[in-house]
Amino acid sequence: MKRRRTFDWVSLLKRLHLLPERLTRKTEAEDLLKQLYDHEKSTGKSPDRLTSRDLNLSPDQLEALQLELEQEGFTEPGALRLTEAGRQRALELTRAHRLYELYLAEHSGYAPEEWHRLAHTKEHKLSECDHERITRLLGNPLFDPHGDPIPTSQGAEPSLPTSLSIEELSEGQWYYVKHIEDDEAESFRLLIEAGLTRDSLFRLERIESARSQIYYEGESLELPTFALVALTLRPAQSHEVEAAHSEEAIRLTHLTPGIEATILGLSPSCRGAMRRRLMDLGFVRGSSIRIDMHSPLGNPTAYIVRGAAIALRHDQARYILIHRPSHAQASE
């Protein structure tokens, strides 16, 4: 399934001043509201001492948005202190954002790099009825696709799990990814390209100040060390590594002609429609698989699985994990 790319019409309309001023101001005010709430939650302090520079706004912008929030009853008069109604609205926006990100992950063809932007636009438009409809569709989820907890309709928001710091990581140790921070676009892009996602297991092979190397799904991957900071990690348990076959699993793209392998499962990065399609086609644990033929340009490749020939592109085949063939098989 080809991932969809979208054009950001809302940003274009803003730049051309074609978006209704009231709608633009309300959206920007709610963005500020979330900033104030996040500051209050992360620091435990009232955000009333924040300046326009702290919030990356001009003094005039801050004054206009502050007035908007006051009129809605979300902040106290003449200050940036949140009212209870303001905290509740900030939680509603957070709930809408994370629900919609999960909806995109499970029921759309959009690339992971686009989920945050699309959800940021949609969060201001979803009603409580929309929240409940999406919640039922997704089966009352607790977390978004990155591992962020989804606030409940009653306003309860679980805390993020604690993470090991970079200084606490050890070479040779297996780690379990509990959460990926998507606010830093460059780090998120690098992690997604590597195939890392919530519930991934990897072994840290080398860690240095600038570059680090991990072993993941049969590949040694080099990443800037700053990208690892975006991961919430804990040491993986031995039974988790064994259950996921992390030591012997490799991506289907590494299968060589003439070798028959056994499918171990699908990568945790394979979600939604793509995951359902691959499973429907027979790419499930225990199935035998071999290469039927390569296309003249090498992509796609036809595989024989459950008696049928199925062509997959490289970006689809990398989601399928197989048991690493033994040396005896490879030499036959």
What is the predicted role of each segment?
Residues N56-Q71, E186-R189:
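Short amphipathic alpha-helical interaction segments
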Residues H124-L266, M274:
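Mid-protein regulatory/catalytic core that forms ligand/cofactor-binding pockets
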Residues L99-F143:
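Amphipathic alpha-helical dimerization/coiled-coil segments
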Residues K2-Q35:
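Short alpha-helical segments that sit at the start of domains
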Residues E70-L80:
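A short, conserved structural fragment
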Residues S42-N56, L80, V177:
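Short acidic, hydrophobic short linear motifs in intrinsically disordered regions
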